C-alpha cells in the first residue's frame, strides 16, 4: 500500500508540472460484439465538441491503421466510465476538459483494474500550445484532480530509446496538432537491468499503462467520413508533415500496446543469447 501511495504521489507531482459532419458521439452501452473485434475507444467528457473530435480522431487513426498495417479496427466506441466495460479496448483516449466530473468510486475501481491488466490510457490535456513546462495549466490541474485516485506509476519523459520511438515507424518525437516539450510514460525501475543503456521493462509486458501529454493527438488524427482532415495542423508542407508524424505516432501506439516489448526484446537478443551460452 505504501508503495502504491508513493508511486501515485510521484505521478501527481509530475502531472502538476505539465503544463464535424457526423452526429455527436454520446455515451453508449458497449456491445459485446466489440470483444471479438479490435476497436479504439475514447472517454465521453460531456463536452460535445471535444467528444466529436475525439471520435473523429479515432476514426482517422483506425483508417490509417487499416491502410498501413494488418490491423483492421472496427468503428471507434465512445465509452461512459460509469456504465461501460473497459477491458474490451487495448487503448482508451481520454481528452481532458475542465467541466468533466470526477468518476465515482466504482468507476475508479474499473480504471485501476484496467491499468493493472495491460490496458493503456492516453491522457491528453490538448494544451501544449499554451502550457509551458514548470507551470500547471488549467487542464493540467484538472488531470491532476482526475488522476488522484488512480494507480498511476512513477513517470518520466519518454526517453529517446523508448519502444514507442520504433514500434513501427522510427520517430524522434510525438507531435499532434501541437508539439509539447514532454510526453510522459511509466518510469523504468531504479534498479532496472541495463543493456547498452536500455532498461528491461517487464511490467505489463513492458507496456506503460499511461501516456500523458498535451499535443491534441485526436485533433491531428481527426477526419471526416470522406477521409479529409477536419482540423488544421501547422502551415503548409510543415503542417502536413507534422500531421503525418502524428499519424505515425498513433500507429506506433497501437503496435506498441499490441506487441508489448517485442521491439525491445529484439534489441536485447545478442546479450540474451550470450547469457544463455554462459
Please name every model-derived segment.
Residues 41-42, 90-95, 120-124, 154-157, ...:
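Structural recognition of the beta-strand scaffold that forms the well-ordered cores
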Residues 36-39, 129-228, 242-247, 251, ...:
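An acidic, glycine-rich "communication" segment
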Residues 53-60, 64, 106, 110, ...:
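Extracytoplasmic/secreted proteins, especially bacterial periplasmic and envelope-associated proteins
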Residues 31-35, 84-88, 107, 114-116, ...:
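Extracellular/periplasmic catalytic domains that process cell-envelope and extracellular macromolecules
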Residues 17-24:
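C-terminal segment of classical bacterial N-terminal signal peptides
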Residues 91-140:
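Short alpha-beta junction capping motif
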Residues 1-2, 6, 10:
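N-terminal export leaders
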Residues 26-91, 98, 217-218, 225-278:
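Aromatic-Pro/Gly-enriched surface loop or interdomain linker
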Amino acid at each position: 500500500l505504501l508503495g502504491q501511495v508513493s508511486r501515485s504521489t510521484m505521478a501527481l507531482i509530475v502531472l502538476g508540472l505539465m503544463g464535424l459532419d457526423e452526429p455527436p458521439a454520446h455515451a453508449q452501452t458497449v456491445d459485446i460484439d466489440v470483444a471479438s473485434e479490435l476497436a479504439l475507444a475514447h472517454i465521453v467528457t460531456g463536452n460535445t465538441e471535444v467528444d466529436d473530435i475525439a471520435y473523429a480522431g479515432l476514426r482517422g487513426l483506425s483508417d490509417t491503421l487499416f491502410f498501413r498495417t494488418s490491423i483492421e479496427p472496427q468503428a471507434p466506441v465512445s465509452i461512459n466510465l460509469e456504465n461501460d466495460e473497459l477491458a474490451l479496448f487495448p487503448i482508451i483516449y481520454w481528452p481532458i476538459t475542465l467541466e468533466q466530473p470526477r468518476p465515482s468510486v466504482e468507476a475508479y475501481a474499473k480504471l485501476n483494474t484496467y491499468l493493472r491488466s495491460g490496458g493503456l490510457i492516453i491522457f491528453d490535456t490538448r494544451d501544449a500550445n499554451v502550457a509551458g513546462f514548470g507551470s500547471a495549466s488549467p487542464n493540467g490541474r484538472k488531470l491532476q484532480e482526475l488522476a488522484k485516485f488512480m494507480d498511476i506509476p512513477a513517470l518520466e519523459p519518454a526517453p529517446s530509446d523508448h519502444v514507442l520511438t520504433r514500434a513501427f515507424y522510427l520517430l524522434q518525437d510525438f507531435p499532434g496538432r501541437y508539439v509539447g516539450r514532454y510526453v510522459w510514460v511509466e518510469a523504468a525501475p531504479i534498479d532496472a537491468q541495463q543493456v547498452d543503456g536500455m532498461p528491461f521493462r517487464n511490467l505489463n509486458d513492458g507496456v506503460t499503462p499511461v501516456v500523458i501529454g498535451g499535443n491534441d493527438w485526436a485533433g491531428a488524427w481527426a477526419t471526416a467520413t470522406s477521409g479529409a482532415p477536419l482540423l488544421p495542423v501547422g502551415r503548409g508542407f510543415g503542417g502536413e508533415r507534422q500531421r503525418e508524424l502524428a499519424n505515425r505516432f498513433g500507429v506506433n501506439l497501437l503496435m506498441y500496446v499490441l506487441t508489448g516489448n517485442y521491439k525491445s526484446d529484439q534489441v536485447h537478443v545478442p546479450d540474451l543469447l550470450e547469457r544463455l551460452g554462459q
